[in-house]
Amino acid sequence: MTTRGIRVWVRLGAAALAVGGAVLAAQQPQTQPSPQQPQRPRERVSEDGGRLERVGPTMSRVVPDNTPYDQWLAQAKARTPIFSGHVIDDARTVALKPWPDMGVDGLYIRMADYQIIDGFVLEIPPHGQTRPQRHMFEEGIYFFGGPGHTIIQQEGRRPERVDWKARSLFAVPLNVKYQHFNDGDKPVRLLAVTSFPFMLNTTDSVKFVYENPFEFRDRYNAQEDYLRRNDHLGPNQTVTNVVPDALEFKLDAYERRGKNTTNMHWRMGGDTMVDFHVSEMPGGVYKRAHRHSSDAFILLLSGEGYSLTWKEGAEKRTRVDWHEGTVFVPPIYWYHQHLNPGKTPARYLAINAPTLVSRLGLRFEDQIEKDPPEIEQEFAREVARRGGTVKKEP
């Protein structure tokens, strides 16, 4: 194998395995967090591999260093407005700046130290449009307003119109030319989540990502039923390419995460790098804590509540208060738990990469089956403060 070939395989490891939060010391899931353990210092793994970081007594991950995506970010700052952090309080009102590459105001979102998925917010002016785009990464888009439409077109094929409104979700077919149009008299915002970091880390070529003529006709071939498909395959599984209203879509029971909770996983656009699911909790209910080895964007669609996130074994937990429009992410392989102390249901959309992680042979998630008393006690206080009742599991 040539030196170039060796480097490509190293990049694949960094992009697909290490940066996805690869579990280097995985053991059986715990039923409760273990006592606080002293954190070991980060250790150098290799020139291309990054640093070893302990994320708990039983877990380690590789923190990538100077990846192709990191290098792209450093150069993009000159012409791209960039947000870096863990929480955007409200994507509907967060400050935006002119983004020449998109043709409208926007904000690129780099969450945590993620290296698989990224995001961005755009605002299309009344009766305006974005610049046409085409790329070799998957993309899911949630629209905060409307009406509007998106034109998608394969080379040499007829254009197709995708109509959307507030709360619509659409997966752009891979490497198809597309452009968004605002048909209304008010500005429209959208949130997009993509697999751009993973593709760039894997190929180390911006030209490959943005100037590739290959057509994925097995995914999209301008077929007449593409936009109408809505096949419910079984509990919590639906194949579709457009969700007209993510807040009204009927969900299935999902008691694995807790009694009275519901959920639906959408397989959209033939995507294999990003996955979509929506979950709902009634008032007075919270979901079981879990952690996973991939990036995950969480967008609140309705309700008010909070989430907790923490490293395995940590006594101190970080609290994120949320409401409609909040976007937040848990750090790789940190536990996180969503709680609804209000009286009305809370629904959220999560976009992550379980299929990608699983196909690499990695364990995707762990779950804590029994909560520590302090979480239950805090939740009971929050529910009481709002005049509600905790719905206990039998």
Task: Indicate where each model-derived feature is located.
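Bacterial N-terminal signal peptides that target proteins for export
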Residues: T2-G13
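Bacterial N-terminal signal peptides
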Residues: R11-A22
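A short, N-terminal "cap"/entry segment at the start of jelly-roll beta-barrel domains
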Residues: Q28, P33-Q115, S205-M273, H277, ...
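Conserved short histidine dyad/triad with adjacent acidic residue
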Residues: D101-L107, D118-H135, H277-H292, K311
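Glycine- and acidic-residue-biased ligand/ion/polar-headgroup-sensing regions
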Residues: P125-P126, H135-E155, G283, H292-E312
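Histidine-centered metal-chelating micro-motifs
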Residues: Q129-R131, H149-T150, S168-H180, Y286-K287, ...
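A short hydrophobic beta-strand segment most commonly corresponding to one strand
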Residues: G140-Y142, A171, D185-D204, I298-L299, ...
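Short acidic-glycine-tyrosine-enriched beta hairpin
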Residues: Q154-P173, E312-P331
